[in-house]
């Protein structure tokens, strides 16, 4: 999908910072800035590298100051807000256009001199390539000077003082290093060293309103200058009257050597190296679209966006899924919810298997990891649903894997893990996760929040859901049924019979205890006692009881639930986490950490449940083909959301009352994954005219 922006999109610096872009390297690293080339968040960097994939991430190249010289005049092309607004760099005044088709490019103009800028990350490596090209009329003396701003610090740090960057030449390239990180630079420009200058007072306008520290900085250690357009050195000139400046950054010396060999084969033309890397990334993204098999342009964009969240995990020598950029790492619950859309829906079968193996390795007392903290080794297990969703992900993988792709040893190990999860949950495990005598699953106590509505602010739980949450018990029934079917396939008759009996018990209790008088579902039941006020709140969690492969809900009741969701929770970009008619409804997400936490699951719109809603509409429709067409029409309206905020991505959340502006992570895995999955169901239903 192509995105074109022009001068009307950056009438002011603040307007220009409303749109951003995201590039990823498949290691957890990324490149992200606004479309005017500014850092509007502390997490914006040109090169955020993963020293250990995917969660030991360092801000290596923060941004670049860009000055175009025309004769004796100088024009600053980059834009950046500063704490003292009079210092703001307003290069957007010279920016004519921005184009993004998976990779960003800019066109600037000053005094008739045109500057184009392109950049790309290199998938699978911590590398960044940037190219500037100047076009000037004959006889016009123009050149560009760039001043990189480096971080060399952990992604979330805001150093007031920095460790000195050591710089030296190594095989005709610049080698920069600190105790923790090192970086190579190849360039066809002239590097001019300068005394290290620390920049502390960038203003990050998109952090301030969210209650985050809205400032940060970096340091400058050199300038890089291009050739002049009037020079006669043909090696630094391409096309008619144009000059190139290329910067190739990398953290792996072997990778840099490969690029040097490529450069030497093209008569030391670093532009050819850049073009190779640029085209390589374009082709990679195109292949993802083709492999997805999706038809509509919107769905094909979602496929690329979903694949962007796939990442390597070094600790298991395998794959995982980044929950959201720029804030989150790979989380258990998010990974399992996004699993289908980020792997199976785009034909990434090997990645799917590897992700399951990654989490199997960390399973403890029947619980899958909830969180791998940024830059730390310990794993957090405070989740009840990740394990149940793992079993669902395993089932979906086994339904998709071909006989040729089948790995009997993996399947046997995975089924053993799934069986152990059921066993631990039955007898009870950590965090008060246990099966009650009625067969239903209860979890949580004290300050531990174990469902996706897990916010905790100090000792305050804005959405306490201790007891028996509705979606957890839908997942529980589904997981028991899946393990039953897998054991049946293995000929385990006794175990199969026991799980069959258990599934019937769960279903009977669920329908009796969770069904409200009007046919909709209670959100959560107290562990011991009758439904309370929290039970009766209308939340989006009941939608997940309709979309599991094994569901307890019949069509008649499903239609009642869908009607309530449509009436009180539905928006075109997601479902509200709480009915807008509830006295506790928060119409806006923003402000201090406390204000944001209190609103997070109290009406804020979440994109990912929308996929489940659309799939349920098709599944329980009397006319699935017609319903699927209507769903496709609604999904195509996501073009507007894809063009807002981070281009080509769907955000984590939106305001509850008027969901016009994205909030939270600007690129969320389960958002794009679940909407892509809804596309798959809808396109299939249109073709075959049946329920999914």
Which residues fall in each region the model found?
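Acidic, mature catalytic/reactive cores of soluble proteins
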Residues: 1-692
